[in-house]
Amino acid sequence: MAEYDKEIENIVDLDDDDELDLVALVSANANDTSQYLVFEGSDGQFYAKNVSKIEELLVYKDIDIARTHSKDLIIGTADIRGNMTTIINFDKWFGNEVLDDSEYELIILAHYGGHRLGIVVKRVEYIVNVPPETMTDNSDNDEKTSFITKVTIGQKKEMCLIFDSDKMLLDVFNTIDTKAMEDTKKIREIKNDKTVLFADDSRFIRKMAESLFNKMGLKYRMYENGQLLLEDLKYITPEEIALFITDLEMPVLGGRDVIDTIRRDKKYDGINIIVHTNMSNDNMVDSLLKAGAQDIIGKVNMLALSESIQKLMV
């Protein structure tokens, strides 16, 4: 992995004995797309999840769980603040050794893609700032990871894997993919000779979007990050572009930078932008709309995405 010129600085050292502090720390950073919660797996490897997808952190032993007796990755279901929430073990999902239950300290309560999910982890370390330019795509090496980066923990540089949250959702809630395919069958072809430019680092999302675009009869180009999309603009005239669709959380260059760059160039003023992301909350939606996006669609609602495409294509 290449050495980075820009230092990744720790924002705060989490005190995992104090649940209230943990909740406050996550909440304070929930609108920043470059903030990640770092935790340790049973293998000693560090993993990370974007804080915008996290509602709060809970002490595992304090949560009453109706446990399943199956051998899959789902531990059971818990009533968390009035919401029945699926609880899974991160190590089991990722393929690591599963430790004794007493070794696990916290539940990361995530809410994205229209689902709440409690992710049981061994220990949380830090909230860190991870700029997109310091991330390297790692999905070819492990389909459950999106990027690899380095973070500073205890004055030492450590490798950190940012896992693919979309893949986790598809694995846990296996009806999502089926529903997306069923929704795609309802979609009709539309007539438009222009090209949709679509950027998303997740191979699973790109595959689903490709199926959607083919069903709609659209011309499209796909990119694994925002930088590749912007570089390709040198070879496409504005008159050829029907629409921009971008994820937010991507390596090298994220979706917010894509929006800002496009909106600074007046020749793209008449072309709409859809943000397709699991990272949206009310404050973030407002921020993206002010930055120049026309719509924010949550993953993985292919029907909603198709409707937005039909409405916003030029």
Residue ranges and their predicted role:
Residues 256-269:
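Short amphipathic alpha-helix used as the core "switch/output" element in two-component signaling
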Residues 239-242, 267-272:
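His-Asp phosphorelay/catalytic-motif detector in bacterial-type signaling
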Residues 274-276:
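Hydrophobic/aromatic residues positioned on beta-strands within the core alpha/beta folds
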